[in-house]
Amino acid sequence: MAARQADLAITYQPQVHFFADEGLPLVRVGTLINSPLNTVIALDKQIKTPADLQGKKVGYSVSGIEQATLATMAQHAGIDPASIKLVNVNFQLTSALLAGQVDAVIGGYRNIEAQELKLQGKTPVVMNVEDYGVPAYDELVIVAHRDAIHEAKIRKFLTALQAGVGYLRAHPQKSWEAFAAAHPELRTELNHQAWLQTVPLFATDPAALDKARYETYEQFLYNNKLVKKVTPLTNYAVQLH
């Protein structure tokens, strides 16, 4: 994207903040999923809230942001983040949890890993990060090069995306059948459940920008020393209405 080899790209809102901190000319122009998907998941029924993670082992895959997220949840619950033992499970979140290697995991998505565990007959305890002190953010966003954000084709894309999302939300099962027919190798019960869980999370107005949400999350990253400075919102996010 920075080299103008594509017009648009899909990424995560936290990554947009990191790009801005590095001085890359990438700007958020639209949103696909306007809710966090990240969760803390446990199978132990004694774990109901982050407060119950004191003295427990929590598996993670991505250092930095997941550690800051878990620490924030712990502080929100009134426990010392240092009382939680973090274990790197190398993206094997579900298997580590099922094998009892950890008491809980962070980084599992509410629309994927939580559904996978249910399909295996488990009853996971799912804690959404934004319910425990972590600022809400957009999970999936669309970025463009700063020099291209006012090109007409980007506005046209966002208009078409809004229409597509409207159809998707109005016809979740019908759209799933069309997708599965086009990609039969992906017709699994997990993908079906993930599809149905994800559809309500698509942004109904992809171009809309919640400025306060982005500024709050930027401050969260700065407070946790994940970015070197607080970058002005206009440097990395716009609303093209």
Which residues does each PLM region occupy?
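Class I S-adenosyl-L-methionine
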Residues: 20, 71-75, 118, 180, ...
